[in-house]
Regions:
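A conserved beta-strand-loop-helix scaffold within acyl/acetyltransferase catalytic domains
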Residues: 1-149
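Glycine-rich loops and low-complexity Gly/Arg-rich segments
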Residues: 6-9, 38-41, 85-88, 154-155, ...
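Short C-terminal domain-edge/linker segments immediately following a structured domain
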Residues: 11-16, 44-48, 91-93, 158-162, ...
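Short amphipathic alpha-helical patches
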Residues: 27-31, 48-56, 70-74, 163, ...
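Short, intrinsically disordered/low-complexity patches at protein termini
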Residues: 38, 48-49, 83-84, 106, ...
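Acyl-donor binding region in acyl/amide transferases
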Residues: 120-125, 131-195
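Active-site/acyl-donor-binding loops of N-acyltransferases
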Residues: 168-231
Length: 231
């Protein structure tokens, strides 16, 4: 709840949509691929999902209006300076608090100005792609721009995604898998939603031809390594 409230204070603009949001969703997914050093799916694949599930699939994106936040922070900074000028010298505690606020706002202004130069006035910070089937739904993919991790955007985006699923008539919303050890960042992130964990046996291969399987698996690994190098 704390992280959701942090995200709400950033005035993130949560948008739901379909293929009109695909370009921005693909960008945050590529950010996740780069951060984790993995290969996920292509933009064409996400488009195929949206085409296949039609109205039963949707994208959720969180937009951060950097320029608006910069202007708001500058206004707070000017007020802080005015309060400092009017603060009596003997009001040491209040003066100390205002000095700390002044330093904090200066850092934020500097950061926002840097972000505007890099990303423009508005940037998509994170998103999810969800499909609905029957009375349940599955959050299949989620991505985030690491440069805006401090905004806690994914916490609010996932919450709004699940809220949307329930509005569409779903009884449950599947958040995907977690580490079998019940430890790690993914578990820490998902546990704030108080999920019910369903444990399955997992994925495994049953070779029907041991000789062909060994040859095919080695070939598969080489192709995967080559694709990773050329990505």
């Amino acid at each position: 709840k704390k992280n959701i409230k942090v995200a709400q204070k950033q005035n993130l603009d949560i948008q739901f949509g379909h293929k009109e949001l695909l370009d921005d969703f693909d960008k945050v997914m590529k950010c996740t691929e780069e951060r984790k050093g993995i290969s996920l799916r292509t933009k064409e694949y996400y488009e195929l999902l949206l085409d296949t599930y039609k109205d039963d699939a949707f994208i959720t994106l969180a937009y951060f209006h950097i320029h608006d936040m910069l202007n708001e922070t500058k206004e707070r900074y000017e007020k802080c300076l005015l309060d400092l000028d009017n603060c009596p010298e003997n009001a040491k505690k209040k003066r100390f608090t205002l000095e700390e606020l002044k330093d904090s706002l200066e850092k934020k202004i500097s950061k926002y100005e840097e972000d505007v130069k890099t990303y423009g006035e508005t940037v998509c910070v994170c998103g999810t792609l969800t499909v609905k089937y029957g009375h349940t739904s599955e959050i299949l993919y989620a991505g985030m721009n690491e440069d805006f991790k401090r905004l806690m955007g994914p916490y609010l985006t996932w919450y709004k995604t699940m809220e949307k699923c329930f509005e569409l008539g779903c009884n449950t919303s599947n958040m995907g898998g977690i580490e079998g050890t019940l430890k790690g960042g993914l578990v820490d992130f998902k546990e704030i939603y108080h999920p019910r964990i369903n444990e399955y046996i997992g994925e495994f291969d049953i070779p029907v031809n041991a000789l062909l399987y060994n040859v095919a698996f080695k070939f598969y690994k080489k192709i995967k390594e080559r694709n990773t190098k050329h990505k």
